[in-house]
Amino acid sequence: MKIGRFFESGRVMYRQWGKYELLVDTPHYRVKHVVIQPGKTIFAHKHVFRSEHWTIVSGTAFIELDGKEGLYYTDDVVDVLPGKTHQVTNAGDTELVIVEVSVGENVSEDDKVSTDVASDNLNSKKLVSESIVYLNPAFKDNLWGGNKLKELYGKKCDFDILAESWEMSAHESGQSIVASGRHKGMLFNDYLGTIGKDNWGWKCSTFADFPILVKLIDAKDKLSVQVHPDDDYAIANENQYGKNEVWYVIDCEPDSYLYCGFNRDVSREEVLQRIEDDSILDVLNKIPVQKGDVYFIKAGTVHAIGAGIVICEIQQSSNCTYRLYDFNRRDKFGDLRELHIDKALDVLNFSKYCPEKINEGIVDGEGFKKRIISQCKYFECTLVDIDSAARILGVEESFTSFLVLEGEGRISVRSINEPDKVKDSISFKAGDSFFAPKSTDIFMIEGQSKIIMTRV
């Protein structure tokens, strides 16, 4: 009997849904540290003699309380009064941590009345309520950046330098944040876990992580001469995807240029020597750029963005970059920036590279034009130039990213079976970024604008 009572009142208790730890335990006041595993549920019950006060420490909770339901996030607070039926589910893909404070005549486990309305089917909760969500970016202050992203797009950033704006990113180095709808405030990767991989589209089924990153780049100064690895090397050595990318030139100063590929065959030894004697630029293709130019940068291709260029970059979701040469620049602490020469030499393509601007055909629509600017195994990017309105069909195979480069207007989402009924509607301006899960909906885009649309 004594042993049984010890286990019933132990400091840490394990349950089918996770565990809790008693931090404070008195007859009328109890504090618990509750951990619920992803997808698990504390099923519906109520208390007669106590109230509970929950604070979400981390994770995403789907809570049903007294006939109402909703999503709750970090720092949200929930009060559960005596006699009110409640149920909590971990709706994310990481542990849900709650601090629970109980106050009342009886705060023990005896004061718990189970009900018959429990459900463990997350899908039945219809957690995906919006057909499209607005994303706030993550910002980067690399030393070569400027402030054109603030000037062109009104990016609200306190950094003195705004080099990059990661518009759609689930990467751990910088995540976007959902900024509209019932998931507002969630980190993008948490949101993706909440809606489930099925809603990314079937082309994403083989990916362990979300596959695409979309960013804006302001190169006030030149970037380092660098190279990205392919998937095989990056997964083996960096535990992340490789990096193939496409550049769309949004704006540039006169006589701007970039470097892409070697202008002749070179050897590993020659590249190493030219890094040491500061002559590596002599064997790179120097390419003048104009607004609207598009370049695909295949993994293994040496490259560098020149000064005075604003670019939209669509890439694999990777932050894997190996610097070969950085013009002997020093960081804000006065130290030479790190180079990654050995790894760069491992992945470089030393053959002559013949750069080509991507110039796919333009398809005329009613009130708009479409131009495919990249189509590869990793992503498909389409520039939609809208004069008045565009009708874009959603697809089952992929999510859709919308990045507004110019103009303003509104995106209305309509069911293909009920095209006169608006499911969701959201306004936009230049610099805005949106994510739409897979669907067969119709996206009606109204307003003169220019938008890059990305799918897998």
At which residue positions do the language-model features occur?
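Short histidine-centered beta-strand/loop micro-motifs
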Residues: 22-25, 33-34, 42-47, 55, ...
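Glycine- and acidic-residue-biased ligand/ion/polar-headgroup-sensing regions
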Residues: 49-67, 179-181, 191-195, 219-222, ...
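Acidic/His-leaning functional-site neighborhoods
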Residues: 358-432
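Transition-metal
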Residues: 1-18, 31, 110, 117-266, ...
